[in-house]
Regions:
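Solvent-exposed loop/turn segments flanking beta-strands in beta-repeat/beta-sandwich domains
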Residues: 172-192
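Extracellular fibronectin type III
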Residues: 229-243
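Short, compositionally biased P/S/T/A/G/V-rich stretches that sit at domain boundaries
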Residues: 135-164, 170-172, 242-243
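A well-ordered secondary-structure block
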Residues: 58-136
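Hydrophobic beta-strand segments within extracellular beta-sandwich modules
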Residues: 114, 219-221
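Short beta-strand segments within Ig-like beta-sandwich modules, predominantly Fibronectin type-III
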Residues: 199-205
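Short, well-ordered surface patches within globular domains
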Residues: 2-66, 103, 109-114, 121-123
Length: 243
């Protein structure tokens, strides 16, 4: 087991510990994991388990220095020297869950994000850090195209033979354990044949768009979502219709 795999195993364990009492999982945050790695590396270098680094800084100092917005922060740390990383992961989680103070942090309803970091010394000591944070929603929403509805071929004065098509889409904000911003709107783009993508709707709350597709041509539509915190999702896979 690699250190990265061990960290992801602990991520799953922590969210399983929450699920066991009916709590939603926390979202892993790469920025918090980077700080957790720094914390674990500092403890490994000092050979000491401590919430205060040798330079006097705490997790709050590091989070603030990295420009991470937060309303509340919790930290759990652990040490063991089990040779197998799988055993080290299991034992540190067990240690946290048999401590009322650590369990209260892991199962708190206040937090919505967390990060994990493992530091290993040359002699095999394992230093673990888990950082829990309550902060603004920074998880982008999702959007996807649905199957289009197509009509029969008709004759239009402007296009000649064409087919009426209605594209529709769905989306929502990804839920957090706390402070989910909520879906705000969609951006929609169209591409005719192999041309450039062009916006046809921006910040719209509608969920469908209709157009006529001329025979011999193709129109593709794609969508992305925005949430109320300003997060913008990725473009969906396009759905195209040829007439």
């Amino acid at each position: 087991m690699s250190p990265a795999t061990a960290e992801m195993a602990l991520v799953a364990m922590i969210n399983a510990d929450r699920a066991a009492v009916g709590l939603p999982g926390l979202r892993l945050d790469a920025r918090l994991s980077a700080v957790a790695h720094e914390r674990s590396a500092s403890m490994a270098a000092a050979g000491q388990l401590s919430h205060v680094q040798s330079d006097g800084r705490t997790v709050v100092d590091l989070i603030t220095a990295n420009g991470i917005s937060w309303y509340a922060v919790g930290e759990t740390i652990g040490w063991n020297d089990y040779p197998k990383l799988g055993d080290s992961t299991r034992v540190v989680n067990q240690g946290w869950m048999t401590s009322a103070e650590h369990t209260a942090i892991i199962r708190s309803t206040a937090y919505n994000y967390f990060g994990l970091g493992l530091g290993i010394t040359a002699t095999g000591d394992r230093y673990w850090t888990a950082i829990f944070l309550r902060g603004p929603d920074r998880t982008p929403p999702w959007a996807t195209m649905q199957a289009p509805a197509t009509g029969s071929l008709i004759t239009l004065a402007s296009l000649g033979r064409a087919r009426q098509v209605t594209w529709s889409w769905a989306g929502d904000d990804r839920p957090l354990a706390a402070l989910t911003a909520g879906l705000r709107s969609f951006d929609v783009q169209r591409r005719v044949d192999s041309g450039a993508w062009v916006f046809i709707r921006t910040s719209t709350t509608t969920r469908s768009w209709s157009s006529s597709v001329a025979v011999g041509h193709r129109i593709a539509i794609r969508v992305r979502a925005r949430d109320r915190a300003g997060n913008v999702g990725t473009w969906s896979s396009p759905v195209g219709v040829s007439a």
